[in-house]
Amino acid sequence: MEDKWRWSLVAAVPPVLWGSTYFVNAHFMPADHPLWGSALRAAPAALLLLAVTRRLPHGAWIWRSALLGILNIGGFFLLLFIAAQLLPSSVASSVMALAPVALTLSAWALLGQKPSVVLLIGAAVGAMGVPLLVGVGTVGFEPWGLAASLTAMLMNSIGSILARRWQGEIPVLHTTCWQLLWGGAALVIAAVVVEGAPPALGPSQLGAVAYLSILATAVAYLCWFGALRHIDAGVVGVVGLLNPVAGVSLGILAGGEALAGTQWLGLAIVLGCMAAVQVMPTRHPALNGEPAEREPGD
């Protein structure tokens, strides 16, 4: 149980950092260059981790990291960009709140992690609390935006589980670096094609890029994939509901925003579901993946 709580705390780091990106992007990054904003998150993070690992993908990990880089980084960020153009942020957050359910079901199908009733209920009820928290109203939205948001959520859920399935004995630092390399390259190409040259950045914007790339991307993804190796994917997914919690909290603390009564109710539901899945019994199912793979020279 102590190990589960420790890794649950690690799993809480990514959604908190990702939740802060809404505020940082809105206040510091150029609003008319969203693709370059995404590329400037992924590419420097990849190069930073590559400088540490000094290893490029090899063997089966060439195509694996390319696929995972598109699912978890490149394609994921691109679809989020499309969704952000077509959907209110509250609707997009509510769609992404379905990720715990998608992660749980993907882990069941690909890893053999049969979810408990408590986990399924916690994931579903927690997802229902997010629309209350972010204040979804009756505003209309584009079907294509909804499709982009749903596809992004499913891609990231499946990509996260595949990363766990294929982990072998390759260090998480290496596999995370390789995914960011492929995803970052795809984003840079997309940014050049769609938006042209990168925007000029001032000191505050360079500071924002450093925060987004080092903390909200490199550190966040290392913690995300590390936690997935040690605790059930469904638990990681439910902890991921801290994403909108962090975003709303930062808006209150730094933006002077106030919560309505229904938003407090949504916050209580999300936090209650997170607490419920932490106290359920821990299972250690065998992985239905490929044989363990070692680094050359190990």
Describe the function of each predicted region.
Residues 1-39, 138-165, 185-186, 288-298:
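Glycine-/small-residue-enriched transmembrane alpha-helix faces in small-molecule transporters
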Residues 3-8, 31-35, 39, 57-63, ...:
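Juxtamembrane helix-entry segments on the extracytoplasmic side of multipass membrane proteins
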Residues 7, 30-75, 102-106, 155-162, ...:
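Transmembrane alpha-helices of multi-pass small-molecule transport proteins
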Residues 17-22, 50-96, 132, 213-231:
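Specific transmembrane alpha-helical segments of multi-pass solute transporters/efflux pumps
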Residues 28, 37, 41, 83, ...:
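Hydrophobic/aromatic residues within transmembrane alpha-helices
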Residues 36-47, 77-114, 119, 149-152, ...:
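Specific alpha-helical transmembrane segments that line the substrate/conduction pathway
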Residues 38-40, 73, 77, 92-98, ...:
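Helix-helix packing/entry segments at the starts of transmembrane helices
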Residues 43, 49, 106, 115-135, ...:
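Hydrophobic transmembrane alpha-helices of multi-pass small-molecule transport proteins
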